[in-house]
């Protein structure tokens, strides 16, 4: 938190609508930083890995040791992956298989909901305060399995679409394309609590959701 006020949250600016993520972070009380090299990870308090094409993103990250440094970062600091970012965080990637950062205890099936023309916007219930959550799906992956310590915050047709595991969050949809800032706000709250030394092994959820509840009233 070099600016002394807002946490510094990186946005991996390789593919996807990273500018929309940056706007959502500003609205949620964080300072966004566009990241394209491993060196730029230094000093960040958290990181968002946006959507895009996961194999293309992976090839970019494999240059100059970026992938290794990114893995070290997400193992210890808050990270939020959306769509392709969710694939990169997952421990198991299916149809077809591919390497990943392997930190989120989940199995993810790529492009499970069909082609981009079949993408959709829907509203679904969530455990976050404030009522149903708008979800924008674009060539979305599907989480087919999550570990016991992964909290499902929202689902679609019985499959998780928004999850949290300690300092990690993942979504198979694009919250940055919605005016609803609750998802980004939750991540920023996790980043802030991590900075304050309240580790993810503690019961963070209740306090974070209470803060969200106050803001949605």
Predicted segments, located by residue:
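Redox-cofactor binding/interface segments in oxidoreductases and associated redox assembly factors
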Residues: 49, 81, 171
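Hydrophobic anchor at the start of a short beta-strand
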Residues: 32-33, 79, 168
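Amide-donor transfer/coupling interface in amidating biosynthetic enzymes
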Residues: 110-217
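N-terminal beta1-alpha1 cap of cysteine-dependent amidohydrolase-like domains
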Residues: 1-64, 69-72, 181-185, 189-217
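Cysteine-nucleophile active-site neighborhood
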Residues: 54-125
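Solvent-exposed alpha-helices and their adjacent loops that cap or buttress functional pockets
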Residues: 2-5, 39-42, 72, 80, ...
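A generic structural signal for alpha->beta connector loops
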Residues: 6, 29, 76, 98-100, ...
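Cofactor-binding loop segments of dinucleotide-utilizing enzymes, especially the Rossmann-like FAD-
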Residues: 14, 84, 173
């Amino acid at each position: 938190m070099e600016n002394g006020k807002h946490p510094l949250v990186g946005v991996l600016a390789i593919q996807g609508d990273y500018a929309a993520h940056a706007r959502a972070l500003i609205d949620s009380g964080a300072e966004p930083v566009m990241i394209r090299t491993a060196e730029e990870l230094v000093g960040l308090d958290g990181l968002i890995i946006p959507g895009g094409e996961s194999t293309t993103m992976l090839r970019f990250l494999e240059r100059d040791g970026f992938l290794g440094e990114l893995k070290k970062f997400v193992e210890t600091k808050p990270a939020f992956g959306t769509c392709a970012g969710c694939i990169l965080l997952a421990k198991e990637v299916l149809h077809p298989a591919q390497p990943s950062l392997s930190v989120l205890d989940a199995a993810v099936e790529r492009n499970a909901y069909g082609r981009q023309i079949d993408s959709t916007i829907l509203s679904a219930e969530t455990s976050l305060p404030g009522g149903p959550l708008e979800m924008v799906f674009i060539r979305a992956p599907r989480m087919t399995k999550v570990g016991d310590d992964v909290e499902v915050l929202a689902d679609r047709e019985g499959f998780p679409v928004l999850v949290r595991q300690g300092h990690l969050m993942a979504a198979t949809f694009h919250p940055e394309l919605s005016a609803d800032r609750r998802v980004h706000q939750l991540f920023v709250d996790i980043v802030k609590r991590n900075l304050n030394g309240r580790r993810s092994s503690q019961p963070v959820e209740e306090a974070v959701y209470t803060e969200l509840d106050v803001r949605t009233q």
